């Protein structure tokens, strides 16, 4: 486990000065490094992020349907987007990781970076209040909220299903072919089977849902050629 570096610089990047540095310390601590890790803060931050982004989208798009709002929110709060924010903050430089995670490059892993962003949101909430969280999250997401649109936010599984239904084809079948790793860091291999392709298409990701989306995206590319 490495010591946390240059916390004042991180606070300036986040736009928030902690009253209780212990909250930030815990938010940056992965379960591989200590029993006092960031998973409970991540749980809290995930809920706060969801309500802040939901509220912002609700007011920004008064004519959008519930489905459009849900898809835009899913795009904005997904692990990939959170990891992008973490990279902008150079969050990997500050994470506390156990020896195994350090050796395997955990400070670059999308899931660890995304979880840390949510944990920091939870830490800020406990250190201040929901309004501070709201303003900070909106600041972090300002450029992303400016460009998000109700169109083209459907996930690959939805797009694939709609495409197949349009041409009266059977719906895809998803099957978990393989899982590996510990419970908290599993890798899922999922097969997507469609009538028009002779072989199943494989998606690999850190969750079953993400692996299914990856496989669906590949199938779409293949059948539209």
Curated annotation (Swiss-Prot):
Task: Name where it's found.
Answer: Cytoplasm
- The answer to whether keyword rRNA processing applies is yes
As given in the record, the signal peptide range reads none
Give the matching Pfam families: dsrm, Ribonucleas_3_3
Q: SUPFAM superfamilies recorded for this chain?
A: dsRNA-binding domain-like, RNase III domain-like
Q: What is this protein called?
A: Ribonuclease 3
Question: Which GO terms label this protein's molecular function in UniProt?
Answer: double-stranded RNA binding; metal ion binding; ribonuclease III activity; rRNA binding
Q: What is the lineage of its organism?
A: Bacteria, Pseudomonadati, Pseudomonadota, Gammaproteobacteria, Alteromonadales
Species this chain originates from: Shewanella pealeana (strain ATCC 700345 / ANG-SQ1)
Q: What class of enzyme is it?
A: hydrolase
Q: Which residues cross the membrane?
A: none
Q: Which cofactor does it need?
A: Mg(2+)
What's a BP term from Gene Ontology annotated to this protein? rRNA processing
Domain RNase III per the UniProt entry, residue ranges: 7-129
Q: Which GO terms describe its cellular component?
A: cytoplasm
């Amino acid at each position: 486990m490495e010591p946390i570096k240059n916390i004042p610089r991180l606070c300036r990047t986040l736009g928030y000065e902690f009253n209780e540095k212990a909250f930030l310390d815990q938010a940056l601590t992965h379960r591989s490094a200590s029993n006092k890790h960031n998973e409970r803060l991540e749980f809290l931050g995930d809920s706060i992020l969801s309500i802040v982004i939901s509220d912002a989208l609700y007011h920004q798009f008064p004519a959008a349907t519930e489905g459009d709002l849900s898809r835009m929110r899913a795009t904005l709060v997904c692990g990939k987007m959170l990891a992008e924010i973490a990279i902008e903050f150079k969050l990997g430089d500050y994470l506390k990781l156990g020896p195994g995670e350090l050796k395997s490059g955990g400070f670059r892993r999308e899931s660890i970076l995304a979880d840390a962003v949510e944990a920091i949101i939870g830490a800020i909430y406990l250190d201040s209040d929901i309004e501070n969280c709201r303003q900070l999250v909106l600041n972090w997401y300002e450029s992303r909220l400016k460009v998000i649109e109700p169109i083209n936010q459907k996930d690959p599984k939805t797009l694939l299903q709609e495409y197949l239904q349009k041409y009266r084809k059977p719906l895809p079948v998803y099957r978990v072919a393989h899982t590996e790793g510990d419970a908290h860091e599993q890798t899922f291999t999922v097969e997507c089977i469609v009538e028009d392709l002779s072989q199943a298409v494989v998606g690999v990701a850190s969750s079953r849902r993400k692996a299914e989306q990856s496989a669906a995206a590949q199938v779409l590319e293949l059948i539209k050629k």
